[in-house]
Regions:
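Conserved active-site and cofactor/substrate-binding residues in soluble primary-metabolism enzymes
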Residues: 55, 79, 83, 141, ...
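Intrinsically disordered, low-complexity regions
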Residues: 1-28, 63-69
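Positively charged, aromatic-enriched nucleic acid-contacting surfaces
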Residues: 56-63, 108-136
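Mixed-charge, glycine-accented linear interaction segment located at domain edges/termini
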Residues: 127-160
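Hydrophobic beta-strand-centered segment that forms part of the acyl-chain substrate-binding groove
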Residues: 97-105
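Non-catalytic linker/capping segments at the edges of enzyme domains
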Residues: 18-53, 57
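Active-site helix/loop of acyl-thioester processing domains in fatty-acid/polyketide metabolism
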Residues: 84-96, 150
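Beta-strand/loop nucleic-acid-binding surfaces
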Residues: 71-78, 132-136
Length: 160
């Protein structure tokens, strides 16, 4: 199997996006296609969550400039939202030139709409000025929304 075919097979397994984005190269791809070199910021592609007893393991997969970024986190099942957010943040770590941790991640009800909310803490600032907040509507999958809320919190810091 050549490198291009091997890469496409990996993307086919890793992506929750339609396979039409992967097959056939870059012809007709839109500028926001996460698998092209033109993607300006990391794009969420998939999140995997496995629960074993009282433990949860999350793996986040993002794409940027045609490259795949993967991050993971394992922890207590009671902290599932924070584990998913931490896995997403772990995938982004190579792109960050500052220290950041997940302060909290949760699903809130906003006038009848479920919203994923992530609060990230930069550096060791505990005054609140080092906080980044991101949100995303839950559109079916809570884990997807949590991952997108982390990207939302870091959006301005990751933009070019």
């Amino acid at each position: 199997m050549d490198d291009l075919t091997d890469r496409r097979e990996h993307l086919r397994l890793a992506s929750s996006r339609p396979l039409s984005l992967i097959n056939g190269g870059h012809q007709g791809d839109t500028p926001d296609d996460p698998f092209t070199d033109r993607t300006p910021r990391p794009a969420f592609t998939s999140i995997g969550v496995r629960v074993t007893g009282d433990r949860v393991e999350a793996t986040a997969i993002l794409a940027l400039h045609g490259h795949i970024l993967t991050g993971g986190c394992i922890g207590d099942a009671a902290d599932r939202a924070s584990i998913v957010a931490s896995a997403t943040l772990s995938a982004l770590t190579p792109l960050l030139d500052f220290e950041v941790t997940v302060d909290s991640a949760l699903i809130v009800d906003a006038t009848g709409h479920d919203v994923a909310l992530s609060i990230l803490r930069t550096g060791d600032d505990h005054t609140g000025s080092g906080l980044l907040v991101g949100s995303a509507l839950v559109r079916g999958d809570v884990e997807d929304a949590l991952a997108r809320s982390v990207l939302s919190a870091l959006n301005r810091r990751l933009g070019h």
